[in-house]
From Swiss-Prot:
Residues 1-19 form the signal peptide. This is Manganese ABC transporter substrate-binding lipoprotein scaA. The complex is composed of two ATP-binding proteins (ScaC), two transmembrane proteins (ScaB) and a solute-binding protein (ScaA). Disulfide bonds: none annotated. The keyword Methyltransferase does not apply. A lipid is attached at C20 (S-diacylglycerol cysteine). CDD domains: PsaA. GO terms for molecular function: metal ion binding. NCBIfam families: ABC_lipo_SloC.
């Protein structure tokens, strides 16, 4: 009986040691990976497409929230402090307005171009209307798929610098991702070439589609220019309504991350319907249409071209 009890205890001890060993192995594997932080869901998704499971990834601004003006949570501060690599958009997105990202990296004692990098480096910057100076840049460069490719290339470059052992994986994933984005970009240009010129205008709440407009030859109009200024004032709405009454624009669009009430007022005053919500500052929730950078852009391109072709 004693011998039997001893064997049972020995077996339990062995199982416990095996479990601890397995847990330790899993922990060691996770801790050996790069700790990477991205400021928003779009940058995080591009990073994930290149890095796969080779990194530990944290995205700061939650899906559906505005990256222009965010208040980091304690978890964001902790992850940023421990990060080996931090990706931010740049072009005055996270550093404009309340400058939340500037404060975050300063408090974490992180250094630019050593610990954190702008993924927009190399993009042909577009400025806010009537402006051409630092601090007046339009940050929404990712809405041009060619810029999305630049983002991906910059992310891959920094991952390889920090983690050369996984260079082959990063380069392979980058190549496949670029091919995917390039094909969608070509498809988009063909779609918008077939829309009559008098219908060709994308109307949104925020004036975020400038890069989109330039890439796909679709003029844009908006209620307010950028989310760090007043949003949806009576004068802003009146100005857009007067502009639209002189056009044959068939559809309006409203972004997923803004209050839709100002655009509903524009729709009522012009009798132009809101065709769809589109994604500009964030991807969609997991499992929904637009829950990755690629699917977000495809969704936008499909909805906008459909709405303007009506």
């Amino acid at each position: 009986m004693k011998k039997c009890r001893f064997l049972v205890l020995l077996l339990l001890a062995f199982v416990g040691l095996a479990a601890c060993s397995s847990q330790k192995s899993s922990t060691d594997s996770s801790s050996s990976k790069l700790n990477v932080v991205a400021t928003n869901s779009i940058i995080a998704d591009i990073t994930k497409n290149i890095a796969g499971d080779k990194i530990n990834l944290h995205s700061i601004v939650p899906v559906g929230q505005d990256p222009h003006k965010y208040e980091p949570l304690p978890e964001d501060v902790k992850k940023t402090s421990k990060a080996d690599l931090i990706f931010y958009n740049g072009i005055n997105l996270e550093t404009g307005g309340n400058a939340w990202f500037t404060k975050l990296v300063e408090n974490a004692q992180k250094k630019e171009n050593k610990d954190y990098y702008a993924v927009s480096e190399g993009v042909d910057v577009i400025y806010l209307e009537g402006q051409n100076e630092k601090g007046k840049e339009d940050p929404h460069a990712w809405l041009n798929l060619e810029n999305g490719i630049i983002y991906a290339q910059n992310i891959a470059k920094r991952l390889i610098e920090k983690d050369p052992d996984n260079k082959a994986t990063y380069e392979k994933n980058l190549k496949a991702y670029i091919e995917k984005l390039t094909a969608l970009d070509k498809e988009a240009k063909e779609k918008f070439n077939n829309i009559p010129e008098e219908k060709k205008m994308i109307v949104t709440s925020e004036g975020c589609p400038k890069y989109f407009s330039k890439a796909y030859n679709v003029p844009s109009a908006y209620i307010w220019e950028i989310n760090t200024e007043e949003e949806g004032t009576p004068d802003q709405i009146k100005s857009l309504v007067e502009k639209l009454r002189k056009t044959k624009v068939p559809s309006l669009f409203v972004e997923s991350s803004v209050d839709d009430r100002p655009m509903k007022t524009v729709s009522k005053d012009t009798n132009i319907p809101i065709y769809a919500k589109i994604f500009t500052d964030s991807i969609a929730e997991k499992g929904e249409d637009g829950d990755s950078y690629y699917s977000m852009m495809k969704y936008n391109l499909d909805k906008i071209s459909e709405g303007l072709a009506k």
